[in-house]
Amino acid sequence: MPKRTSLQNMGEAGEACVRQYLEEQGWQILAQQWRCRWGELDLVASRAGELIFVEVKTRSGQGWDQKGLLAVGIQKQQRLIRAAQAFLSQHPDLAELACRFDVALVEQRPGKEGVSYALADYLQGAFELWE
């Protein structure tokens, strides 16, 4: 089994931060790091008849890509939509729920006691399904 990279660990820490945020908002996490041939869904959650697919971007600094937002371009959105469709085909009981694609931007912050992770921005309905 390959070694985990610090980027993978940072990504997982960012996902854990967003997972906690969503659970505090009353969302039930249905899947984390769900994979299919089209890619990975970082988080899938439901609440009150609504289903969200959350793409989490974790960055250690300001960077050039607006804290990860620019990394969710058209091609990435298309892969996420296909992955969401694959998820729904495997979970037909969820197919009638209203679906939304959100993007969570997480910052890694250095501190005296090590690094911490904080939700920098949460974009509800960051993009939509197009025909």
Swiss-Prot record:
GO terms assigned for molecular function: nucleic acid binding
Q: Which residues form a coiled coil?
A: none
Q: Name one Pfam family in it.
A: UPF0102
Q: Which PANTHER family match?
A: UPF0102 PROTEIN YRAN (PTHR34039:SF1)
* Family according to the record: Belongs to the UPF0102 family.
The protein's name in its UniProt record: UPF0102 protein CYA_0708
Organism for this UniProt entry: Synechococcus sp. (strain JA-3-3Ab)
